Regions:
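Short, hydrophobic/aliphatic alpha-helical segments
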Residues: 35-51, 158-162, 312-323
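Long amphipathic alpha-helical segments
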Residues: 2, 9-113
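Short beta-strand segments
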Residues: 23, 61, 65, 97-99, ...
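Conserved phosphate- and dinucleotide-binding cores of soluble alpha/beta proteins
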Residues: 190-191, 198-368
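Generic structural signal for well-ordered, non-membrane alpha-helical segments
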Residues: 36, 40-43, 55, 59, ...
Length: 368
């Protein structure tokens, strides 16, 4: 997508052919900073510290993390360590394990002399596949927005509500939930996005608002608790969110607060769609609430807030009393019954076991 008018990806191979460049998302929206990853441990830190985030991008970064490890040491022990270190960084996003399994399959059975080239080749393929998948999601979701636009008066906007950041910053390019939004905008459809701030990390405020602005998509930043009010007053036409894991039964694990948006959407007859790339499906899990591990993050993410001062300094200040007990769950699960449809690269399907297995039979069969 565009940054200051220049086509940009969220992850790339540096000109030296082996180190990996990423955008440091912790610096956005106030500074555009890139970071070079040169070791397995640097890649793991980037994932763990949310320098990069978003399920597809976590997978892509993990893939290159394996490649960096193999470059230093192509032994079986090095491969196993890379797998274990990266898998432990973020437990909820299934793309992480999917990408690591793909890398192991591509590298493990090769002679050591071939492993370096094979690892970098598969990591690059995973990145290109992500772009193709998300482009497919955009094409699948575009008719939904076109249908909503057809009911509007001339020049009246389709209003989309989204939660967290499922944009190109969460993927290699174009994003998942934003893919149909960007395509609609580029097709000249009047579209406007309500972006939840998404406490406590504020990905909606810091990332979604930034990237929508860079692409010229009209948008309004709202507090997390505003969505239900907007829906009650007919100001939201559709909710489109991303996901970090979808179960075989269609339950959706996404950023904390997504479940509340789905409940509000159901109560107000607003369609609730989930943009789902196929690597995010976990056919090994059926009940999302009972089986998906929910990451619990540091208390300071809730008890403090970071922003830019009037003098231009980036500072973190505490907003809760010292010693306050904090619960910081990173994700929640929206039951399949609340999901209008899953927007996949193979079309819009029901959030059900039959629909998922029908659309992706090879992946469903591999999980048995």
């Amino acid at each position: 997508m565009n940054v200051n008018g220049k086509a940009t990806r969220s992850i790339w191979l540096e000109p030296n052919g082996w180190s990996v460049g990423v955008i440091d998302q912790t610096a956005l929206p106030h500074r555009l900073v890139t970071m070079r990853l040169t070791t397995l441990d640097e890649a793991a830190h980037a994932i763990r510290a949310m320098v990069i985030r978003g399920a597809p991008l976590i997978g892509a970064t993990a893939a290159y993390g394996v490649a960096l490890a193999v470059r230093e040491d192509a032994s079986d022990e090095s491969l196993e360590r890379a797998y274990a270190v990266l898998l432990a960084t973020r437990p909820t996003a299934i793309n992480l394990k999917w990408a690591l399994d793909e890398m192991m399959a591509a590298v493990r059975n090769r002679p050591r002399a071939e492993r370096n080239a094979a690892a970098y080749r598969r990591a690059a393929e995973i990145c290109e596949e992500d772009i193709a998948i998300n482009t497919g999601i955009g094409r699948s979701g575009l008719p939904l927005i076109e249908a909503l636009a057809a009911r509007k008066k001339p020049r009246e906007c389709v209003n989309v509500l989204t939660h967290c950041n499922a944009g190109w910053l969460a993927a290699v390019d174009i994003g998942t939930a934003t893919a149909p939004i960007y395509m609609a905008h580029d097709h000249g459809i009047p579209i406007h996005v309500f972006a939840d701030e998404t406490r406590p990390r504020n990905q909606g405020a810091s990332l979604t608002a930034w990237e929508l602005g860079q692409h010229g998509v009209p948008h309004t930043l709202i507090a997390d608790n505003t969505g239900g009010h907007l829906m009650q007053h007919g100001l939201v036409d559709v909710v489109i969110v991303g996901t970090d894991r979808v179960t075989a039964n269609g339950d959706v694990c996404n950023k904390i607060g997504t479940y509340l948006k789905a409940l509000a959407a159901r109560d107000n007859n607003v369609p609730f769609y989930v943009a789902l790339p196929s690597p995010t499906i976990d056919f090994a899990v059926a009940d999302g609430v009972a089986e998906i591990p929910i990451e619990q993050r540091a208390a300071d993410e809730v008890a403090t807030v970071t922003g830019r001062t009037a003098e231009g300094r980036i500072e973190t200040v505490r907003i809760a009393p010292d010693g306050t007990s904090v619960a910081n769950y990173g994700f929640d699960v929206t039951p399949a019954r609340l999901v209008t449809g899953l927007i996949t690269e193979r079309g819009v399907i029901a959030a059900s076991r039959a629909a998922l297995a029908g659309a992706f039979p090879k992946r469903a069969g591999a999980a048995k």
